[in-house]
């Protein structure tokens, strides 16, 4: 557990006003992002069968919450970590065409999360996925889509200002693009997360590209990424510099998804070739899955950003250690 406590924190809104702002942001943003990216809202599972291989393995070390059910003896059911692979499967199952996509309200439990101002064991995000052509699996496509997502986030600043002018946090006017290798070359002495802090403070908002593969200097990845959804050469995180806490705030991870070649190479690099026998992976390697781009946009993180909140627990209901709750109460941080 770690906690940043800002000096003289003013939440600006009461808890009930905050709840109204959360409702407004969530309802407005999902409509706006759906229109911008041509996405249809779809119902999504909260749990999947382990045997399908559809759950997100995240960094490969976090264990999902799992259980068994009476009518499926011998099958382990897992609470989702995210819907990264399920969405691609759903696009195929429901017959989505080129440049059509879906978004879901995804709720997950990540029981092994390290808790801090931004991280909770409860995860809520808009998970989205869109069909693209194979020839569109390019950096240009990725950057254009990142700019579309940023445009909607920036527009939300104005929407929130109109309704809650006393609370809105002002965002930069543009997003910049950097690579993880470029950051390592510039600051080899810093850790990857320290590099993100540096570049976010310098530029205001950045898309940090190419996450998952080993960097040239250190021989270590910038950050962990599962090998079976993002193409590590065509992905990244949208990160804002967040003045209230004097640190970076990641709002979205997204990327162009693996094709057959990238899946095979990344499974080998991750020493996870056994996954190739799972139904999802088998279909993808056989060329039976659509080519897609997709990502997740944190709902609580976005509310926190737009309202200038000091803790994610001010915009979502979760469980926190007593020590954290006491420190927040002293600092006027109103946990729900």
Swiss-Prot record:
SUPFAM superfamilies: Class II aaRS and biotin synthetases (SSF55681). Its main location: cytoplasm. Pfam families: AsnA. It is found in: Cytoplasm. Pathway: Amino-acid biosynthesis; L-asparagine biosynthesis; L-asparagine from L-aspartate (ammonia route): step 1/1. One of its GO terms (cellular component) is cytosol. Disulfide bonds: none annotated. It catalyses: L-aspartate + NH4(+) + ATP = L-asparagine + AMP + diphosphate + H(+). Belongs to the class-II aminoacyl-tRNA synthetase family. AsnA subfamily. This is Aspartate--ammonia ligase. It comes from Limosilactobacillus fermentum (strain NBRC 3956 / LMG 18251). The lineage of its organism: Bacteria, Bacillati, Bacillota, Bacilli, Lactobacillales. The gene is asnA.
